């Protein structure tokens, strides 16, 4: 087992391209995965991902940091939050999200299960 490891998101282990989105995944070993989510203006989870996964809201847990753009997130409990550059965030399962404005949203995510399965199930 390696005690030090690095991967570059510009050379990902896996790339997925759902509508208006690109997800680059890196596998750091020991069941640790991370994702770079690049989301285009006009992207909305309930329009672009919901048809693929078949749930009413996103059922993934998100732990990440925004490096560019803005994302609005609403939860089925009635709460909402907007994240922007420099914001660390968590979104519990049961949310919808969309890009705010005309800038691309880029977030790096560190929940291994979400990084492995986002836009797949």
Describe these PLM feature segments.
Residues 1-38, 46:
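A short, N-terminal "cap"/entry segment at the start of jelly-roll beta-barrel domains
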Residues 23-25, 34-38, 63, 80, ...:
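Conserved hydrophobic/aromatic beta-strand scaffold that supports enzyme active sites
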Residues 30-32, 43, 87, 93-95, ...:
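Surface-exposed loop/turn positions
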Residues 36-57:
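Conserved short histidine dyad/triad with adjacent acidic residue
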Residues 44-45, 69-74, 97:
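Short beta-strand segments in beta-sandwich/barrel cores
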Residues 55-73:
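Short, conserved beta-strand element in jelly-roll/cupin
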Residues 92-118:
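Ligand-binding loop in jelly-roll beta-barrel domains
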């Amino acid at each position: 087992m390696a005690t030090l490891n690095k991967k570059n998101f510009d050379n990902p282990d896996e790339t997925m391209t759902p509508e208006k989105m690109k997800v680059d995944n890196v596998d750091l070993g020991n069941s640790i995965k991370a994702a770079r989510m690049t989301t285009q203006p006009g992207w909305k989870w309930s329009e672009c991902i919901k048809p693929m996964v078949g749930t009413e809201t996103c059922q993934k847990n998100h732990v990440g940091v925004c490096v560019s753009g803005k994302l609005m997130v609403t939860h089925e409990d009635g709460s909402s939050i907007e994240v922007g550059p420099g914001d660390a965030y968590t979104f519990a399962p049961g949310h919808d999200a969309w890009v705010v404005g005309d800038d691309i949203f880029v977030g790096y995510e560190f929940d291994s299960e979400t990084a492995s399965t986002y836009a797949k199930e």
